[in-house]
């Protein structure tokens, strides 16, 4: 049954109301199957049904807040997280899923802001702001995400082979006042392989062909198995000019990107050889 969130939430709600737990399970399963709809009319009809179900679940959680809180380690805070998660399910359903379906069915998208990849990152930025300002306003946070999502100005990064700029990402949509409070780290590898997140099965090797002035190649010269490079406190000079000038780096170890590292990251973690993750 779905992922860890789905399983744990189902068991949590089940302790209060079995029928609502089953309703939650049904909504999650329907959400996963939504992209299988053959026509837009069928899609929208199913979309409305799922949205109504999540609204019913939101109302249930609000009504049974105290009961649910007593059954959870962090009590009230866990209920707040659950409500935010249900809200995000609805927003994903109503803002992201149809554009994603359109792309899968070759329906043209004329407004780049309505592209599912852009919508996804805008929603990520909105959620991060909520977590930082509303849920954990006095605490430090660690946000783990792919380089593509966390770097600060993704729209300035280019596909090196085509000269075309990337789409806006989460970092682009975060306000400057927010970004000034963050320390953003990019992670890159020289060799090895990683697990493809699209199926958690395919092993994708790191491209062996390297530009001699690329990020990966330059840090290889240090002759260490791993490195951390701070970019914030590194002044410009002849030896550090590579941080301030356009540089090739590999997206997921295989796609050439061109960027000015200083515009994107506050630090870099470089690993000489990576190995694929093992799914537990």
Task: Label every PLM stretch briefly.
Residues 1-280:
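Structured catalytic-domain cores with a bias toward divalent-metal coordination
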């Amino acid at each position: 049954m779905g992922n860890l969130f789905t399983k744990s939430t189902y068991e949590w709600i089940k302790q209060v109301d079995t029928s609502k737990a089953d309703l939650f399970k049904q909504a999650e399963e329907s959400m996963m199957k939504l992209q299988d709809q053959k026509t837009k009319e069928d899609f929208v009809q199913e979309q409305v049904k799922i949205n109504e179900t999540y609204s019913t679940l939101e109302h249930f959680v609000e009504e049974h807040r105290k009961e649910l809180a007593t059954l959870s380690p962090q009590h009230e805070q866990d209920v707040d997280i659950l409500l935010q998660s249900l809200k995000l399910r609805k927003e994903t359903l109503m803002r992201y899923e149809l554009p994603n379906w359109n792309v899968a069915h070759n329906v043209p998208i004329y407004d780049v802001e309505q592209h599912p990849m852009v919508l996804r990152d805008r929603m990520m930025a909105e959620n991060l702001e909520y977590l930082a300002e509303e849920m954990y306003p006095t605490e430090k946070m660690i946000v783990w995400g792919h380089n593509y999502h966390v770097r600060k100005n993704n729209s300035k990064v280019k596909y090196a082979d085509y000269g075309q700029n990337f789409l806006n990402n989460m970092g682009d949509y975060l306000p400057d006042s927010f970004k000034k409070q963050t320390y953003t780290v990019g992670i890159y590898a020289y060799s090895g392989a990683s697990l493809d997140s699209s199926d958690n099965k395919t092993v994708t090797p790191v491209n062996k062909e390297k530009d001699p002035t690329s990020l990966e190649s330059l840090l290889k010269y240090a002759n260490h198995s791993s490195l951390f490079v701070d970019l914030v406190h590194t002044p410009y000079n002849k030896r550090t000019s590579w941080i301030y000038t356009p540089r090739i780096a590999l997206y997921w170890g295989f796609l050439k990107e061109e960027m000015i590292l200083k515009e994107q990251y506050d630090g870099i973690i470089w690993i000489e050889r990576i190995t694929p993750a093992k799914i537990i």
